[in-house]
């Protein structure tokens, strides 16, 4: 009889308490996509909050800085621009990641810290999130 072998996603290098986990907020319109991405990012050791665009402005005002924001390709440009400007103004230590889609128009530089094609793999997403989380922790 063969034993089952479990292959984990990415494991955090060191165990952290839930309060010490880096915080990530993802904003999008597709509930299922947000749920799946949250599971993947959470498995790598992050606290993930998934919200819709209409909830984002209230979230910016509620929580202090030091987070990574992930903007899904399902958002419209005007939503992206308004949210990015609000976050930059209220929480300058936060880092912003834009997941791009096939039909994205050229967007102004400086709104986001990083861009990532939404069809890239999980490993690349986690690398970019990790890099931005370190930058946001240093910026606090």
Residue ranges, per PLM feature:
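Short, structured coil segments at secondary-structure junctions
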Residues: 44, 92, 110-112
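Alpha4 helix (beta4-alpha4-beta5 surface) of REC/receiver domains from two-component response regulators
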Residues: 82, 97-123
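Short hydrophobic/Thr-rich beta-strand motif most characteristic of the beta2 strand and flanking loop
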Residues: 45-55
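Short, charged/polar "capping" segments at the starts of alpha-helices
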Residues: 32-35, 58-59, 77-79, 103-108
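Non-catalytic signal-transmission and effector/linker regions of two-component phosphorelay proteins
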Residues: 1-34, 38-40, 62-65, 89, ...
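Conserved phosphotransfer microenvironments
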Residues: 55-59, 66-93
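Structural motif
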Residues: 26-31, 53, 71-75, 99-102, ...
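Hydrophobic anchor at the start of a short beta-strand
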Residues: 48, 94-96
């Amino acid at each position: 009889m063969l034993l089952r072998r479990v292959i984990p996603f990415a494991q955090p290098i060191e165990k952290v308490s839930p309060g010490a986990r880096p915080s990530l907020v993802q904003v999008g319109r597709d509930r299922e996509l947000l749920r799946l991405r949250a599971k993947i990012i959470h498995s790598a050791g992050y606290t993930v909050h998934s919200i819709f665009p209409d909830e984002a402005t209230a979230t910016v005002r509620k929580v202090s800085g030091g987070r990574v924001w992930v903007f899904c390709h399902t958002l419209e440009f005007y939503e992206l621009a308004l949210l990015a400007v609000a976050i930059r103004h209220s929480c300058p230590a936060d880092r912003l990641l834009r997941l791009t889609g096939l039909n994205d128009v050229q967007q102004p530089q400086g709104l986001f810290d990083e861009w990532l094609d939404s069809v890239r793999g999980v490993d690349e997403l986690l690398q970019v999130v990790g890099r931005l989380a370190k930058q946001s922790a240093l910026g606090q």
